[in-house]
Amino acid sequence: MSEAWSPAPENTLESLRHGIVNTDGIEFDIRMTSDNQLVIHHDAEVSISPERINDRSKWVDEWSLDELKEEGFCSLDDLLNDSEVIEHWREKGKMVCLEFKRPHRFSPKGRRLLKNSESVNSMAKTMKLTESKLDEYEIPQQNSVFYSFFKNMKRPVLTSQIKRNWAELMPNIPTFGSRTFKRLVAYPQYLITPISRLIKRHRTAGAAMIPCAIEYFTPLYGRALIGKRVGFRDKQIKFLSSQQKGMPIYAWPARPDYEYRVLSAGLTGLTDN
């Protein structure tokens, strides 16, 4: 009898390979290391136990790529050098969403990015390096999208002359604070941004798609929104389509119990399951 399958740790080559092989695509987070390399890592702090950090900095951007790889984390180069990943990404048309993370405001690097122009330049540098690597491996432009919780995402896109698809994640969330704090900051923005305004903002900016919180389609949160509601009923889907005008919407997090309704509404679901 075969052993029960267990998922590989997050942000490892094994887990990313499994995702792109067995689904329509994957999403991961990109950060710049201390030696200006690209690592796939979600949190601003290195995701290992305090005992393993010892007396080193806890911030990802203070570690070199080799140090992070020694702890099992995957670089963008590692991913692109994997033949199975490349086959599915480049040859089989799988979609990859790359979320760009800024340094934490309290990290040494984050404290140096006090001016908005400095943050824009830092984001532009990370995005340009990423695009050059994807171009090197001939990843089709339609098979990738760049996005970030970065206000006025269009600025680093123009600064770095990015040619790939991009979008801005909204509401805008600070790099610091607990999960609860970030939600408290985000919800007021969310409540005053109906789906029609969200779509218009992305279309006007020139974004290629619309990342959208699943809360827009749930009854509880939908009722609290200012403006016309959307959901999974026929009339609500028709209204949504009239606003989209063909522009794709990626809804997140699309839990398994929402999957059928998300797909039936003509949306793309992003999930961490």
PLM-predicted stretches and their roles:
Residues 1-273:
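Phosphate-group recognition and catalysis centered on beta-loop-alpha active-site segments
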